[in-house]
A protein has these predicted regions:
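Binding-site signature for planar aromatic cofactors or substrates
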Residues: 1-213
């Protein structure tokens, strides 16, 4: 991925936050017929540097890839169109053009298949706990009949991606003046695009902390 230095995201906590906030990753694999991409919700095990997930047994991805095959998982964070009209300097110089701001994390690693009940049951339970946490009465696997759950688990296969390296990019108008960035963030808030607005404002706080050190 092309990452200019001023757009490089190096803060590990910020990278983890994107993966956890936008867990639907794109698993890119190389097959005999070419590149393949599958959209899968992942769980990050930060201590082990591993991504865990499951796929349908009918999905050929787990059979097409050899154990330890090199793969790429892409996580897209907040993103938004940015109009030059939002920048005060545009109205002074008329030398700005539209752009697109975004956050993205590329996780490189090696794929291993975990086709056994303990792994599959564990990853399903953990993903469920995380994503049901905001519900008034969170659903849990024990809410369904054991035989039904057993049948569902047999229809999926577990996978892990052992992380080898991570590239992360946050294009948040860092190449613009402070007043331009602040104005763009305000316009995004007005348009209900809080995720990108908050990301840009969080970047400003990071700069402020750095200036005080």
């Amino acid at each position: 991925m092309y990452v200019p230095e001023h757009f490089a995201m190096k803060d590990e906590d910020a990278i983890v936050k994107i993966i956890q906030s936008y867990p639907l990753g794109v698993l890119v694999t190389q097959t005999e017929s070419g590149l393949d991409a599958n959209h899968i919700p992942f769980e990050l095990d930060r201590e082990r540097s591993v991504l865990a997930a499951h796929v349908a047994r009918a999905n050929p991805v787990w059979e097409q890839c050899q154990q330890g095959a090199e793969v790429l998982v892409i996580f897209r964070g907040s993103e938004s169109y940015i109009s030059p009209n939002w920048y005060p300097t545009k109205h002074e110089t008329h030398r700005l053009v539209p752009t697109w701001n975004y956050e993205v994390v590329h996780v490189h690693g090696r794929l291993t298949v975990q086709d056994h009940d303990k792994f599959v049951r564990g990853v399903v339970a953990r993903l469920t706990r995380v994503h049901e946490a905001g519900e008034p009465r969170p659903w849990k696997m024990g809410d369904s009949a054991p035989a039904f759950i057993d049948g569902m688990l047999k229809a999926i296969v577990g996978i892990e991606v052992v992380i080898t390296r991570i590239e992360a990019k946050a294009k948040l108008s860092q190449n613009r003046e402070l007043r331009d960035r602040q104005s763009a963030a305000e316009m995004l808030h007005k348009r209900g695009q809080a995720d990108m607005a908050n990301a840009m404002q969080a970047f400003e706080k990071t700069i402020a902390r750095g200036d005080k050190q």
